[in-house]
């Protein structure tokens, strides 16, 4: 078990602790929380956990610019040798344990369209789907659907968003198509009632 104080030397909110417990229990997580509330920390925990297990973690975003920014942030945080980047026109350290990419790139991996890899999904502990509200996009939403449907069931899905409106429906759907129980947690924008969580009865 990871020592949380070693990685996060500050008090965590209840919803963050709930999400961390869910990940440690082997569940996937759907987390919708307001911007600035600390939901990115959950993705960082999944990365720390994967590194501690000598496993890989993929961090996906909908935009090349956001992927580039996350790559720079993670390279500063974890070290350049541990972080790679894959977008449509950039490939850096693609065998790194932390691999940042656009969601379309991950979808293509799931369809076996990356022959130059021996097995890019081998030892993949978790995949973080940042800005997962793009699933509701009429033009690109199918990319997220295909990603979740074809993601190996042994791999935890960490879906993060500030704005997804039907998070409970997304939770139920992921439970059906992906396998592991998904834990849905979200925070209220009210500072007096910031934490609200819903755990599936099977958890």
Where would I find each of the regions flagged by the language model?
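Conserved P-loop/Walker A NTP-binding site and adjacent catalytic elements of P-loop NTPases
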Residues: 14-160, 171-173
